[in-house]
UniProtKB/Swiss-Prot annotation:
One of its GO terms (biological process) is tRNA thio-modification. The keyword Transferase applies. This is tRNA-cytidine(32) 2-sulfurtransferase. Belongs to the TtcA family. Homodimer. Its cofactor is Mg(2+); [4Fe-4S] cluster. It comes from Psychrobacter sp. (strain PRwf-1). The thiolation reaction likely consists of two steps: a first activation step by ATP to form an adenylated intermediate of the target base of tRNA, and a second nucleophilic substitution step of the sulfur (S) atom supplied by the hydrosulfide attached to the Fe-S cluster. [4Fe-4S] cluster binds at residues 170, 173, 261. Pfam families: ATP_bind_3. It catalyses: cytidine(32) in tRNA + S-sulfanyl-L-cysteinyl-[cysteine desulfurase] + AH2 + ATP = 2-thiocytidine(32) in tRNA + L-cysteinyl-[cysteine desulfurase] + A + AMP + diphosphate + H(+). GO terms for cellular component: cytoplasm.
Length: 368
């Protein structure tokens, strides 16, 4: 799967989103009543022909607005973290869930219009879970004309034999799946492995490690594997799960359930996901603020000695004189102060001089 290139080009989100949706459609959607925002797509309403046409028009306009939003978020994530470069072969790991379908769909669109050349190939690992509908993904990918590989490997039996009864299979299953996909990416020459984790997955992992792992870490948007053989990317890093749910409904992806093995989601992660949903309902900007904080880390304000050299901190005072501004300084046990060389009558500056400018002094030696 080779591609010829001329000169290197950058991935510009403006090129991605330009002319994707008609401005008139945007205006129409913006004027819709907010109560209709989560209209169920499967409602069976008794509508007249005119109402049916209008209803379909509203849904179409709303979908185009959502589609534009997701494409823009993905293209910005790709640009911000240099996820995809000219000549890359991107292996999209497709599980049959809403996230990986959405990721694949958007990357295929970006491939067609991006100012750089890259290839996309879908890969699914059939782990032989009982009841797994083996024909669903191959049929979908074939119908869409998407180049793909379906890998068959009975990791389910391995997981079942090593995980104690009553424990969740998810962690062991994920590790085995990851190892198989990493190796296959190298085998076919894929230069990037694209995973479908979204913003809420990243936040949940952050709190899982914070509450139960004693560490400040999450899922990075881009990661070099421990063996340095693969680069993982998460182009949905800026996308909210609730938008993916809506997008998948609109697109009517053939979703394959993720709990065919009967294993339940990790209880700790499930509780954190519930917490995040409650926060989002009560405080719509809270999750966005937390994610922004993950991009704005100040190592000197934390306590990790590996990230910041606290031991080497030294004073760097100049010779300028700074007097206390106030009304009085009471001195106690002056003889002890004198013995250690500290002033017994410190100079004082009238507080009025500080208030004359009608502003609060902003000097903060701790933060500065």
């Amino acid at each position: 799967m080779q591609t010829n290139f001329s000169q290197p080009q950058t991935f510009n989100p403006a090129d991605i989103t330009r002319n994707v949706i008609d401005n008139n459609q945007d205006d129409m959607v913006d004027s819709l009543d907010s109560d209709e925002e989560d209209l169920d797509l499967d409602l069976d309403l008794e509508l007249s022909d005119e109402q049916e046409i209008a209803h379909k028009g509203v849904k179409s306009a709303r979908f185009k607005k959502l589609q534009k939003k997701l494409r823009k978020q993905v293209s910005h994530a790709i640009r911000d973290f240099n996820m995809i470069e000219d000549g890359d072969v991107v292996m999209v790991c497709v599980s049959g869930g809403k996230d990986s379908y959405t990721l694949l769909d958007i990357l295929l669109f970006l491939k067609r219009i991006a100012p750089i050349n890259f290839d996309v190939v879908a890969v699914n690992l059939d782990q032989k879970q009982p009841g797994y509908p083996e024909e669903v993904l191959p049929n979908y990918l074939q119908q869409q004309g998407i180049p793909h590989y379906i890998l068959e490997k009975d990791t389910y039996s391995v997981v079942k034999s090593v995980v104690p009864e009553g424990k969740t299979y998810c962690s062991a299953c994920s590790r085995l799946r990851r190892g198989s996909l990493y190796g296959f990416a190298k085998q076919i020459g894929a230069t990037k492995i694209a995973l479908g984790h979204h913003r809420d997955d990243i936040l949940a992992t952050f709190f899982l490690n914070l509450f139960h792992g004693g560490s400040l870490k999450a899922m990075p948007p881009k990661l070099l594997s421990d063996d340095k053989q693969n680069v993982l990317i998460r182009p949905l890093a800026y996308v909210e799960e609730k938008d993916i749910i809506k997008y998948a409904r609109y697109k009517e992806f053939p979703i394959i359930p993720c709990n065919l093995c009967g294993s339940q989601e990790n209880l700790q992660r499930a509780m954190i996901n519930d917490m995040l949903r409650q926060w989002d309902d009560a405080h719509p900007q809270r999750l966005a603020s937390i994610f922004k904080a993950m991009q704005n880390v100040a190592p000197s304000q934390l306590a990790d000695r590996e990230l910041f050299d606290f031991e080497s901190l030294t004073l760097q005072r100049d010779d300028s004189k700074r007097d206390f501004e106030g009304h009085n300084i009471q001195v106690g046990v002056a003889n002890e102060l004198a013995e250690i060389g500290l002033p017994t009558q410190p100079d004082i500056k009238p507080f009025e001089s500080a208030t004359a400018a009608k502003k609060i002094p902003t000097i903060n030696p701790i933060i500065d």
